[in-house]
Swiss-Prot record:
Residues 186-215 are annotated as: Disordered. The gene is cldn7b. GO terms for molecular function: structural molecule activity. One of its GO terms (cellular component) is plasma membrane. GO terms for biological process: adherens junction organization; bicellular tight junction assembly; cell adhesion; cilium assembly; epithelial cell-cell adhesion; establishment of epithelial cell apical/basal polarity; otolith development; pronephros development. This is Claudin-7-B. The keyword DNA-binding does not apply. The keyword Cell membrane applies. It comes from Danio rerio. The chain crosses the membrane at residues 8-28, 82-102, 118-138, 163-183. Coiled coil: none annotated. Residues 1-7, 103-117, 184-211 are cytoplasmic. Residues 29-81, 139-162 are extracellular. Residues 186-195 have a biased composition (Polar residues). PROSITE patterns: CLAUDIN.
Length: 215
């Protein structure tokens, strides 16, 4: 049967991954202004996230602006936003399904094989959600690298990785590890017990004896 400790560990990792995905999606520090070349002015630090852009001054003041129109955003940012939202929703759904199939819960009936299969289904959903977040983070990362090394990009508009993208990466890997543990915890099922075949007496094919005993 499914190992209880493996299920608990997988569920915990996926839950931590969900927290990381939510924090990473909300934070505006997906990319930050890079101070390269002649761009050494550090009085203002620019950050851009999936939902807003912020400017931090050396005095401690902060100004953030939410993106007004979706149509003004580039395709990479729109795809990253959509994939991260889908990843969070799938992770929440996967945790709900997996919790019903875990051995330490009373949901999903008393059939242990059925419960382990439910836990496996939840693990698969979690893995799909993690893959969505990995694709989103990878896409955004490649966009930052491509713009940074593009010779036609002005120096004052070059960006490097922010803290949010690392948190999102960590959440994605925790999610996929937890989903893999839950998916691999399914048992193969119980085979029907093999009862010994009942041995029937072999009937004799000889005709009954016609001899009679005489006194």
């Amino acid at each position: 049967m499914a190992h209880k400790g493996l299920q608990l560990l997988g569920f915990t990792l996926s839950l931590l991954g969900l927290i990381g995905l939510i924090i990473g999606t909300i934070m505006p520090q997906w990319k930050m202004s890079a101070y390269v070349g002649d761009n050494i002015i550090t009085a203002i630090a620019m950050y851009q996230g999936l939902w807003m852009s912020c400017a931090y001054q050396s005095t401690g003041q902060q100004q953030c602006k939410v993106y007004d129109s979706v149509l003004q955003l580039d395709s990479a940012l729109q795809a990253t936003r959509a994939l991260m939202v889908v990843a969070i929703l799938l992770t929440v759904a996967g945790l709900g399904v997996a919790s019903m199939g875990m051995k330490c819960t009373n949901c999903g009936g008393d059939d242990k094989v059925k419960k382990s299969r439910i836990a496996m289904t939840g693990g698969i959903i979690l893995s799909v959600g993690a893959l969505c977040s990995i694709v989103a983070c990878g896409w955004f990362t490649s966009q930052i690298i491509r713009d940074f090394y593009n010779p036609f990009t002005p120096v004052n508009t070059k960006y490097e990785f922010g803290a949010a993208i690392f948190i999102a990466w960590a959440g994605a890997f925790l999610d996929i590890m937890g989903g893999g543990m839950l998916a691999s915890s399914c048992s193969k099922g119980q085979s029907s017990p093999n009862y010994p075949k009942s041995s029937r007496p072999v009937k004799s094919s000889r005709p009954p004896s016609s001899s009679k005993e005489y006194v």
